[in-house]
Amino acid sequence: MKKLLIASLLFGTTTTVFAAPFVAKDIRVDGVQGDLEQQIRASLPVRAGQRVTDNDVANIVRSLFVSGRFDDVKAHQEGDVLVVSVVAKSIISDVKIKGNSIIPTEALKQNLDANGFKVGDVLIREKLNEFAKSVKEHYASVGRYNATVEPIVNTLPNNRAEILIQINEDDKAKLASLTFKGNESVSSSTLQEQMELQPDSWWKLWGNKFEGAQFEKDLQSIRDYYLNNGYAKAQITKTDVQLNDEKTKVNVTIDVNEGLQYDLRSARIIGNLGGMSAELEPLLSALHLNDTFRRSDIADVENAIKAKLGERGYGSATVNSVPDFDDANKTLAITLVVDAGRRLTVRQLRFEGNTVSADSTLRQEMRQQEGTWYNSQLVELGKIRLDRTGFFETVENRIDPINGSNDEVDVVYKVKERNTGSINFGIGYGTESGISYQASVKQDNFLGTGAAVSIAGTKNDYGTSVNLGYTEPYFTKDGVSLGGNVFFENYDNSKSDTSSNYKRTTYGSNVTLGFPVNENNSYYVGLGHTYNKISNFALEYNRNLYIQSMKFKGNGIKTNDFDFSFGWNYNSLNRGYFPTKGVKASLGGRVTIPGSDNKYYKLSADVQGFYPLDRDHLWVVSAKASAGYANGFGNKRLPFYQTYTAGGIGSLRGFAYGSIGPNAIYAEHGNGNGTFKKISSDVIGGNAITTASAELIVPTPFVSDKSQNTVRTSLFVDAASVWNTKWKSDKSGLDNNVLKSLPDYGKSSRIRASTGVGFQWQSPIGPLVFSYAKPIKKYENDDVEQFQFSIGGSF
């Protein structure tokens, strides 16, 4: 006769059917095999040969059931054998997600892992259904009310299961109508203008898609409008969002209670001011008394008070604005109640997220010191300086309190590093110049030290160049930088369609020291050496003027030059790559020094500014201008290979690289004494250049706000001019018939211009740059290159 001992868990309680104790000569586990069977045996409180009681059986069932790995657990006696029978839950062997595009697959997988649905976990179907429901609710929150999320479980042999999350995101519901109620003073059209979401209209491509998160932002924009226009008691009392039966259209009603419109009568500061009353009181002057109340003005003063206190160590100060309404006169007074709190000392500066950059490198950019009073201005300056390095996508800072201390904090900078090393490969195609290739290997944060190391090269049909560079920005503790270059160039310009004919071999090196003046200004000085060998050059007019001034004899030119370089730099950009605010400017020069064969100098000026048009810096105006001037001295002319040209990305998009400038005039007999009558499209260049560019940086379509700082789309207009300031005297040696066929190369007004669209992406594989430009002002024989791109890979 079979005696049964059954224990089960029901609603958290144990029910046991009693039987007489017995000695289990053997223990059998039914329902599973392999590792899981062994795990069950190891967890049992009894072993074969031991006495088994009803309490033992109850404990066995309870412990196995609460483990969450079994749908059913039973135990019974068969003769002198204890039998444990289980129905095991499936083990997840694979997880797949299909049909999603709005929510990234990686984000969904991270949430699945966090909720117990990674490979190797026990499958709990109820939790899987709850997860699918939460994902569907998220889609509804972004206006996709018809989205479906179906969890599909495929049962496999050996108690395994595959999970497929099948998603159909569907389209967002459209905002069909928008109605305001209760707005007696402010028109509905004015309130609607404050919103990004707009009712369905034929010309609306994106703005009519309803999204819950954006709707909440729009409601806040309406509140802000009222509060910044005197309606200090205005409230949104009710919102009604109604879906049609098909869940494709949304009708929204917003009820407001405007209240009275107030003027600001007075303002004062009271409370614990940390002994800084004299510094805080003047901040009230920013408020416009006896004018319409604006909450944003009050917020600005609150922030200014916190910032001023923060500069003195009061890093946890609070400011609460208390209004006193006079409804009869429609005025209000504001009392700013300040609590400076305790003065804080910085115990440590800590860094998070810098897996490549060394802590010591980041500390070089800090202005807040450990063991000193907390200074919010210096802490923020550290963030700005880290941003300017260009090593990071994002930089955030916070204050962490110290356990057991009420006046010590740690300042923590959390960074997200970007790929600062790159292998770039560029291609350009021009109507005249054909295909050219450029390649470079660069690491802006070498071994996490902040040093920049680069190898750049160019190879095309008419030459090769290589440049090795190194810059150590922290050469001394005072911030002096040290940089240097070694370069080699070998060109046969006779094969170029845009450059005047000659062969040139150049090599040299230079070293530069940079000295900081303050947070935004620095200057530099440097020394360099350059060797040039020019051969196989056709007799050309401008080149001949240089040869005569140098008194060279024969067909070859060899020069050794030593130069002194100097300059000033200004930088207030908010970050090192893709800046959105600030100005960067420089003035520089280079002049040959005694011991040189040549005698010449070159001067340059560059400025670029970024001006955000919105709070989020998604719309930005950028303006850039540069100028250069060069000339010889001591009765010697500027070398013809030191002239300026324009064209290409960086100077004038839409035109081939180096294709803009005065053209060469060859002798009728290239290596004889013929007269200079042969006008060419080859570019000899000029001794003066100006370039200008204006860009409107716009949000990149179909890219989330979070990713906007890794891509950049812009509409631009470029312009450039290259001319010869000595043309008036230089042309005197030319035949009049030749002059009639030549433009005035001395006119700076011979401007080329182009307009187009540019796109840049700091992709995971490296920087990608594309531009398409159409010339809007060009001259005969200009080499047009409308499409240009550069593709790189990172390491």
From Swiss-Prot:
POTRA domain location: 22-89, 90-170, 173-259, 262-341, 344-418
Keyword Nucleus included in the entry's annotation: no
Subcellular localization: Cell outer membrane
Any GO CC annotation of this UniProt entry: Bam protein complex
Domain of life: Bacteria
Signal peptide (UniProt feature, chain positions): 1-19
GO biological process, one term: Gram-negative-bacterium-type cell outer membrane assembly
Keywords: Cell outer membrane, Membrane, Repeat, Signal, Transmembrane, Transmembrane beta strand
UniProt xrefs under HAMAP family: OM_assembly_BamA
Role noted for this protein: Part of the outer membrane protein assembly complex, which is involved in assembly and insertion of beta-barrel proteins into the outer membrane.
Assembly behavior: Part of the Bam complex.
Similarity comment: family membership: Belongs to the BamA family.
Protein's name in the database: Outer membrane protein assembly factor BamA
Name of the gene encoding the protein in the UniProt record: bamA
